[in-house]
């Protein structure tokens, strides 16, 4: 009986008939979140937040704990799947004008920032060579903040260098932040259902809606099943595809890796940071690469919501997708020509998308009026 009541609530939820597969990534993100929390709990049970024991505890979990290798790989590959889903979810929001539901978009961008922080803290926990040096480089950017930077960095590190207190803090933050993500996700979903989902045409859906259950529940379940299948296949055949070879060595203060880089899902922001040959400028560009998403609802000047009917913005959108991939690629390369030049051009084009939103919207309105 309780299950019938839950399904009845879903049945009462009206959804536009024409929403496509791109609208399924929200439920996939919810599944990823649940999976990460469950696997994270089992990993935390066997983890030791100590610089001398952290790396050994990871090896112990992989070798000696029953199904520990599966939990570890599910958690690591689950994080990559989480970011793949969130980037597609955001791209859909940008393309179809979902950002015009301002509160939902702003809460979603805040969620992205929290998620990136959580993933960064988690990347440091194995205390491998790349974990340690990525943490050193990224946290050191705080020193670029005038007046407060050095104090903030010392507070975050728990001393004058990354050491045992740093690892303890990062573990505590990695454990507590997901609860904030759950709370903010609930708010995000509540704000979304105040107005309802948009649709590919960007029109009002009130005239043509169907119940969420059974139509969209089966569609969601199909996409979730496909995602889990891809994850399990990756874990079975390519478990280390996203891992850096340097991270299979314990952190060593005396040896610097040839090329320090974070996980693949941060490479676009890291590439933007590296494209500016100035510490403060790079740190600001890094922050702006995410923060600029907050401006999108306020720079929309077009009369049409979706990019389906906006050819100029479509061109800019696909340029944005291309620059995202190019910046990610250049960030994996050494800091030398021609990669620095490519990275600088791609970073400029990345920010151009957000700045052109205002002008191109106005231009498209003018063209539409002329045609009429």
From Swiss-Prot:
Pfam families, from UniProt? Answer: Cytochrom_B_C, Cytochrome_B
Q: Which UniProt keywords apply?
A: Electron transport, Heme, Iron, Membrane, Metal-binding, Mitochondrion, Mitochondrion inner membrane, Respiratory chain, Transmembrane, Transmembrane helix, Transport, Ubiquinone
Q: Which cofactor does it need?
A: heme b
Q: Where does a ubiquinone bind?
A: 193
* Gene Ontology MF terms: metal ion binding; ubiquinol-cytochrome-c reductase activity
Q: Which residues bind heme b b566?
A: 89, 188
Q: Which InterPro entries match?
A: Cyt_b/b6_C, Cyt_b/b6_C_sf, Cyt_b/b6_N, Cytb/b6-like_sf, Cytochrome_b, Cytochrome_b_C_euk/bac, Cytochrome_b_N_euk/bac, Di-haem_cyt_TM
Report how it sits in the membrane: Multi-pass membrane protein
The UniProt entry's coiled-coil ranges are: none
Subcellular localization, as worded in the UniProt entry: Mitochondrion inner membrane
Annotated transmembrane regions? 25-45, 69-90, 105-125, 170-190, 218-238, 280-300, 312-332, 339-358
The main location class comes to mitochondrion
Matching entries from PANTHER family are given as: CYTOCHROME B
Complexes and interactors = The cytochrome bc1 complex contains 3 respiratory subunits (MT-CYB, CYC1 and UQCRFS1), 2 core proteins (UQCRC1 and UQCRC2) and probably 6 low-molecular weight proteins.
Which family would the database say this protein is a member of? Belongs to the cytochrome b family.
Q: What is this protein called?
A: Cytochrome b
Q: Which organism is it from?
A: Sanzinia madagascariensis (Madagascar tree boa)
């Amino acid at each position: 009986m309780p299950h019938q009541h839950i399904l009845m609530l879903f049945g009462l939820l009206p959804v536009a008939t024409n929403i496509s597969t791109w609208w399924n990534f929200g439920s996939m993100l919810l599944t990823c979140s649940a999976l990460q929390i469950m696997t994270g709990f089992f990993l935390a049970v066997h983890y030791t937040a100590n610089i001398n024991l952290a790396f050994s505890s990871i090896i112990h979990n992989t070798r000696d704990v029953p199904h520990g290798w599966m939990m570890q790989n599910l958690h690591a590959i689950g994080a990559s799947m989480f970011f793949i889903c969130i980037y597609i979810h955001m791209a859909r929001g940008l393309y179809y004008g979902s950002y015009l539901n301002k509160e939902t978009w702003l809460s979603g961008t805040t969620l992205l920032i929290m998620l990136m922080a959580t993933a960064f803290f988690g990347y440091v926990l194995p205390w491998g060579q790349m974990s340690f040096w990525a943490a050193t480089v990224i946290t050191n950017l705080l020193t670029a903040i005038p007046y407060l930077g050095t104090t903030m960095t010392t507070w975050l590190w728990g001393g004058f260098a990354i050491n045992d207190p740093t690892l303890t803090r990062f573990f505590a933050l990695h454990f507590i932040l997901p609860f904030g993500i759950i709370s903010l996700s609930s708010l995000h979903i509540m704000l979304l259902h105040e107005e309802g989902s948009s649709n590919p045409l960007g029109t009002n859906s009130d005239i043509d809606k169907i119940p969420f259950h059974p139509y969209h529940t089966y569609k969601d379940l199909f996409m979730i099943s496909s995602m889990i299948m891809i994850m399990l296949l990756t874990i079975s055949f390519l478990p280390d595809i996203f891992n850096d070879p340097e991270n299979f060595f314990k952190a060593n203060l005396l040896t610097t890796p040839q090329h320090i880089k974070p996980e693949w899902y941060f490479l676009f922001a890291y590439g933007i940071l590296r494209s500016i040959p100035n510490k403060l400028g790079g740190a600001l560009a890094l922050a702006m690469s995410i923060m600029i998403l907050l401006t999108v609802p306020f720079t929309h000047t077009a009369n049409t919501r979706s990019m389906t009917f906006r050819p100029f913005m479509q061109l800019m959108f696909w340029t944005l997708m291309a620059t995202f991939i190019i910046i990610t690629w250049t960030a994996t390369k050494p800091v030398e020509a021609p990669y620095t030049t490519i990275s600088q051009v791609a970073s400029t084009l990345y920010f151009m998308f957000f700045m052109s939103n205002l002008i191109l919207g106005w231009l498209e309105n003018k063209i539409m009026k002329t045609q009429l």
